[in-house]
C-alpha cells in the first residue's frame, strides 16, 4: 500500500508540475505575441544544453551512489558536485559577461540552480520522501508561473528577457530553500581532499557517459535554432507553440506508462505476457496513433485562436503534425519497455542514437525546403526506429531463451 501511495503522490506531483506551464501558455502567447514566443523558444533551447555540461547528470550520480553505497557519505558527492557546477558555471558566466550577452548570462545562472534543484529532488526521491519531493516540485512550478505574471505585468519592454529572469529567480529561490532544509538534516561530517578527489572522479565517470544520452534529447531541439536563423521569429513562434501544445499528449502518455510499467514487468516475470503480445499491442497501437491528429483536424481553428490569441493563425497545422510524432511514442514504449525489463541499456542507447541520426538526416534535408515540412523530421525519427526495435527485441528474446 505504501508503494501505491508514494507512486500516486509522485504521479500527482508530476502532472501538477507539468500542467501549470501549459495553463500559462494562453497568457504568454498574448503577452509575447508570435515573434516574442519564437524568440523565447530559441533562447530556452540553450538551457538544457547548459544543464548537461554544468550538471553532468549529478541527480543520477547521487541516486546511484545512494542505492549502491548508502547515505553515509552522500553529502560528499553532493558537495563535490556542487563545487564542480559552481566552477564550470562560473566560467560560463565569465564568458557571457565578456561577450556582453545578458540573456545568456541569465540562462547559465539559471542552469546552475536548476542542477542544484534536481540534486535536491533526487535526494528526496532516494529517501522515499514523496511529499517533500512533490512539494518542492510543485513549489518550483507555481513560483515560476507567479513570478512570470508579476514580471510581465510590471514591465512593458524586453518581455522575453523578463520571462527568463522569472525562471532564474524561481530556480534560485526554491533551490536555496530546499538546500537549507537539507543542510539542517544532514550530518556535516568533515571530509579530506582525497575523498573529494574520489567523489569528483565518480561524478566525472558517471556524468561523462550520460552526456551522450542526454545530448540526444538536446539535438532534437536543434530545429528551433535552425528555424530562428533561417526563417522568421514569427514562423518559429507558430512552430514552437504547436510543439508545446502537442507535448501535453506526451505528458499523459508518459504518466500512464509510468503507472503501468510495474504491472507490465510483473506480468513479464510471471510469463503471462510475452514478447509476441507486446509486438501485437505495438502493431495495434498504430491504429491509435493518428486519432489525436484527426480529432485536432476537425477542431475549428477559431477555438485555438481564442485560447492562444488571434496572431497564432496557422498553429493548428503544426499541432496536428507534432501530435502524430508524439503519438508514435505509444508503439515505441511497448517495445522499449521490454528492453528495460531485461536491462538492455546498450540496445536502448543504440536505438536513441539511431533515432536521433534519422531525425538529423531528415532535418538536414527538410531545413532547405519550407518551415511547414520541418516537423516531419520528428515523425520520420519516431517512425524509423520502430522496425529496428522490433528486430532487437526479437533477438533479445532469442538470447534469453538460449541462456535459460
Swiss-Prot record:
Location of the protein in the cell: Cell membrane
UniProt xrefs under Pfam families: Polysacc_synt
Keyword Transmembrane helix in annotation: yes
InterPro entries noted in UniProt: Polysacc_synth, PolySynth_Transporter
Keyword Phosphoprotein in annotation: no
Keywords: Cell membrane, Membrane, Transmembrane, Transmembrane helix
GO cellular component, one term: plasma membrane
Transmembrane annotation, as ranges: 9-29, 36-56, 76-96, 103-123, 135-155, 162-182, 199-219, 236-256, 288-308, 319-339, 366-386
Membrane topology type: Multi-pass membrane protein
Family assignment from sequence similarity: Belongs to the polysaccharide synthase family. HI_0867/HI_1700 subfamily.
PANTHER family xref list: LOCUS PUTATIVE PROTEIN 1-RELATED
Full protein name: Uncharacterized membrane protein HI_0867
Organism: Haemophilus influenzae (strain ATCC 51907 / DSM 11121 / KW20 / Rd)
Amino acid at each position: 500500500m505504501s508503494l501505491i501511495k508514494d507512486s500516486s503522490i509522485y504521479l500527482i506531483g508530476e502532472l501538477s508540475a507539468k500542467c501549470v506551464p501549459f495553463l500559462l501558455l494562453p497568457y504568454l502567447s498574448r503577452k509575447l505575441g508570435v515573434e516574442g514566443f519564437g524568440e523565447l523558444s530559441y533562447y530556452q533551447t540553450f538551457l538544457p544544453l547548459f544543464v548537461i555540461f554544468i550538471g553532468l547528470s549529478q541527480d543520477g550520480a547521487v541516486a546511484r551512489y545512494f542505492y549502491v553505497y548508502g547515505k553515509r557519505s552522500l553529502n560528499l558527492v553532493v558537495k563535490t558536485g556542487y563545487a564542480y557546477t559552481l566552477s564550470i558555471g562560473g566560467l560560463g558566466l565569465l564568458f557571457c559577461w565578456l561577450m556582453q550577452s545578458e540573456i545568456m548570462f541569465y540562462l547559465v545562472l539559471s542552469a546552475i540552480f536548476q542542477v542544484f534543484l534536481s540534486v535536491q529532488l533526487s535526494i528526496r526521491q532516494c529517501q522515499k520522501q514523496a511529499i517533500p519531493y512533490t512539494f518542492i516540485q510543485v513549489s518550483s512550478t507555481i513560483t515560476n508561473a507567479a513570478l512570470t505574471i508579476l514580471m510581465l505585468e510590471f514591465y512593458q519592454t524586453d518581455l522575453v528577457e523578463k520571462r527568463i529572469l522569472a525562471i532564474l529567480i524561481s530556480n534560485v529561490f526554491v533551490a536555496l530553500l530546499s538546500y537549507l532544509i537539507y543542510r539542517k538534516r544532514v550530518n556535516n561530517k568533515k571530509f579530506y581532499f582525497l575523498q573529494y578527489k574520489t567523489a569528483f572522479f565518480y561524478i566525472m565517470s558517471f556524468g561523462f557517459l550520460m552526456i551522450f544520452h542526454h545530448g540526444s534529447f538536446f539535438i532534437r531541439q536543434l530545429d528551433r535554432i535552425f528555424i530562428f536563423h533561417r526563417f522568421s521569429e514569427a514562423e518559429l513562434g507558430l512552430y514552437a507553440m504547436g510543439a508545446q501544445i502537442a507535448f501535453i499528449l506526451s505528458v499523459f502518455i508518459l504518466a500512464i506508462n509510468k503507472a503501468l510499467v510495474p504491472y507490465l514487468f510483473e506480468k513479464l516475470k510471471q510469463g503471462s505476457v510475452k514478447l509476441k503480445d507486446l509486438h501485437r499491442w505495438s502493431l495495434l497501437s498504430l491504429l491509435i496513433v493518428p486519432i489525436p491528429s484527426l480529432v485536432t483536424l476537425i477542431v475549428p481553428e477559431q477555438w485555438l485562436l481564442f485560447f492562444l490569441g488571434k496572431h497564432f493563425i496557422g498553429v493548428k497545422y503544426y499541432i496536428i503534425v507534432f501530435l502524430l510524432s508524439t503519438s508514435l511514442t505509444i508503439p515505441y514504449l511497448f517495445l522499449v519497455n521490454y528492453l528495460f525489463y531485461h536491462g538492455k541499456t546498450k540496445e536502448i542507447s543504440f536505438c536513441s542514437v539511431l533515432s536521433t541520426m534519422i531525425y538529423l538526416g531528415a532535418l538536414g534535408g527538410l531545413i532547405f525546403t519550407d518551415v511547414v515540412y520541418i516537423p516531419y523530421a520528428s515523425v520520420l525519427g519516431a517512425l524509423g526506429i520502430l522496425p529496428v526495435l522490433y528486430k532487437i527485441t526479437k533477438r533479445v528474446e532469442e538470447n534469453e531463451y538460449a541462456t535459460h
